[in-house]
Amino acid sequence: MKKEKSSAMGTPYTFEGRIPLKQAIPLGLQHVMAMFIGNLTPLLIIMGACGLTADAGYGALRTALLQNAMTVAGIVTLVQMFSIGPIGGKVPIVMGTSSGFLGVFKSVTAVLGQGALTYGAILGATIVGGLFEGVLGVCLKPLRKFFPSVVTGCVVMAIGLSLIPVGINYLCGGSGTNDYGSIQNLFLGMVVLIVTLALKHFTNPKGILSTASILIGILVGYVVAIIMTMVLPHTGTAVLEDGSTVSYTYSWVVNFQQVKDASWFALPGIAGFGKLAEVKPVFRVEAILPVAIMFIVTTVETVGDICACVESGMDREATDSELSGGIICDGLGSSFAAALGVLPNTSFAQNVGIISMTKIVNRMALSCGAIFLILCGLCPKIAAFVSIMPQSVLGGAAVMMFASILVSGIQLITKEPITSREITIVSVALGLGYGLGSTAGATSELPYYIQLIFGGSGIVPAAVAAIVLNIICLLYTSPSPRDRG
């Protein structure tokens, strides 16, 4: 099927064409709000695992790497949407630092120990792994037949199912917080959810209040959090296992000190040089092999993200060139990220949820969000203002966005007649595949590399189960209406 024709003027619901900046900027910003925290969190976790903490004297390095994470996300997003030769699928996908590699990176630190050299080994492995994924993208076309709508639908559903608990954790204040699930956190999340739903469904569907409902809901929640910070107590007391008590600051409190301390302007650095001289990429086999395996996993997830994005936002299937270019950008974008000292940069399912819910796919709107990310990298003060937003505010929008990804997967599967074959594939993929991968400890007795691929997330086992069953059904059962069509 042909892509949308380019025109001088477009609408928020067409990929190409210009729209007024008063529309494009807020529509782009709501994508940034959805992914901002998730873009930085993996980097903070891995720097901590490597011992690169502020207390250890790496405060300036951490700031520089966080700055680069925002800059890279913006640049790679622009490449994904506009493409440079075969790099980029020209699809409305937002790119960001992947959390899918956390498990394998932690295992690398367990093998190599803490320190800047270990972080450098992670960067070196990412450079090699990203190039490997780029090759997979070039070779994708012959493999496309293994990804019919029932398979991609299962992958998309698994992505949605895996993200829903993440949204709930945000809503409750963030995993590990002392006031997890507090009334204040739930109240903030519900304010965002109610405002978003009200604007989405009770205002002009084509107006800015409806199309930017997620951004407005988040901003309203942010303002409410600031007001609560001004009028309510900031601290509580937790009782430890030994009976002693400890004081803590509530997770919903907005602290502007980080904004005051941040500088107005800073240029990004390159790994191994200048302010990033301590994290020079090194190439260790112990790191490269497991990371390369995870890039295969990332390829499957990116296929699902692109299929969900195009299907839900453009009402058609993704083309071979879109999938191939998207995966090449995923891989080479990750290598580029490592060259700038940060972790793999891949498609963000959170933003697919926004597209599934709003149907807004305009490239100019998403470009405004990408440019804002680059500005955040160049102006740390702007980044700090966004980063101090309470997680419960984001959670109010996230629970709905992530669930909409699940709905997109259902739409992919049900857009053609459902036969017993499709029912079998979906049932086994989600029941055995997703259930096995998402249940803690289910793979704990299996070999290490099996755990690495299938443990901790139901996405990959669901994809493998769906692909294998689809091949078996094609070989040994009579054609379904989908095959004949």
Label each region the model flagged.
Residues 1-19:
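Short, Lys/Arg-rich, polar N-terminal cytosolic tail immediately upstream
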Residues 21, 47-90, 286-363:
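Membrane-embedded helical hairpins/re-entrant loop segments and their flanking transmembrane helices
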Residues 24-193, 381-382, 388, 392, ...:
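Early transmembrane hairpin of solute transport permeases
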Residues 31, 72-80, 129-137, 156-166, ...:
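Hydrophobic core segments of alpha-helical transmembrane domains in multi-pass membrane transport
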Residues 39-40, 221-230, 240-334, 338, ...:
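Membrane-embedded hairpin module used as a gating/binding unit in multi-pass transport
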Residues 54-58, 108-117, 161-207, 234-274, ...:
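Inter-helical loop and helix-membrane interface segments of multi-pass membrane transporters/permeases
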Residues 85-86, 334-340, 347-434, 451-453:
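Hydrophobic alpha-helical bundle architecture
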Residues 476-481:
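Conserved small/polar residues in nucleotide/adenosyl-binding loops
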